[in-house]
Amino acid sequence: LLAGSDAEQEHKERLRKYSGAKKHSVAVAEYIVDHEPLLFKEAEVVRLCSNWLIFRYFYTAGKYRMIGGCTCKKHLLCAMCALRRSAKTVMAYSAKIGHVMTENPGVIPVLLTLTVKNGPDLEERMQHLESAISRMIRNRSNARSGCRHQTVFRLVHGAAGAFEFKRGSGSGLWHPHIHLYALVDAETDLMAMEWDMSEEWRKLTRDSHNVDVCPL
C-alpha cells in the first residue's frame, strides 16, 4: 500500500471519526457512573466498547475493512455503535434509493430539513416535531390519493430520514429537527418549493418556518 494513497487517506479519516466517537462514549460512561453509581456495570460496557478493532486491507478491492472488534451494541448510549449503525443504514437505503432512481429517471434527490422552535424540554419539543410531521404526512397522503386537500408536500414522491437533536452551548435550549433524503421531479422549482413549504410548515408547527431544500 503506497503512502498517501486514497485507501490510506480514507482509512485515516475513518479512524479519526472512530476516535472522536470513542472519546464521546467514554464521556457518556463517566457521566452515567457519576450520576447513577448503581449502573456501573452498564457504564463499563459502554466505556470498553471498541477498545480493540481489527482491520484488513483487501488489495484487490483497494479498501480497508473492519473484520473484528468488541462492541457494546448500545447505539442509544454509545457514539461508536451509533456511528457504525448509521453507516450500515445509509448503505442499505442507498441501494434502495439507487434502484428507485434507476427505474424512475425523471426524479432527483434533495436534502429536506424541517425544524421547530428551540425549547428547554426535549421531550415536549420532540413530540411537537413528530406531531407536525404526522400531520404533514397525512395531508400529503390525502392530496396524492385524489382528495381536494392541497399541500406542497405532495411534490415529494418518497423520502427516508432521521431525527437529529442539538443543544445550544450558550442557551442550553434543545434544537430538534429532521433531515430527509427526498425524491422530487427533476423539473421542480426548488426555490419555490422551499418557499411554499416554509409557509405550510409554519401553519403546521405554529412556531417555525425553518425549512431548507438543498439539491444533492
Residues covered by each model-derived region:
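N-terminal alpha-helical interaction blocks
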Residues: 1-67
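Short metal-coordination and nucleic-acid-contact micro-motifs, chiefly zinc-binding Cys/His arrays
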Residues: 63, 71-75
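Divalent metal-coordination and catalytic microenvironments
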Residues: 71, 112, 177
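Short, cysteine/histidine-rich loop/knuckle motifs that typically chelate Zn2+
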Residues: 77-83
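Short, non-ligating residues that shape and space the ligands of small metal-coordination modules
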Residues: 87-88
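Short cysteine/histidine-rich metal-coordination sites, predominantly Zn2+-binding motifs
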Residues: 92-104
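N-terminal regions immediately upstream of nucleotidyltransferase
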Residues: 103-122
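Conserved His + Asp/Glu catalytic blocks
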Residues: 117-126, 134-216
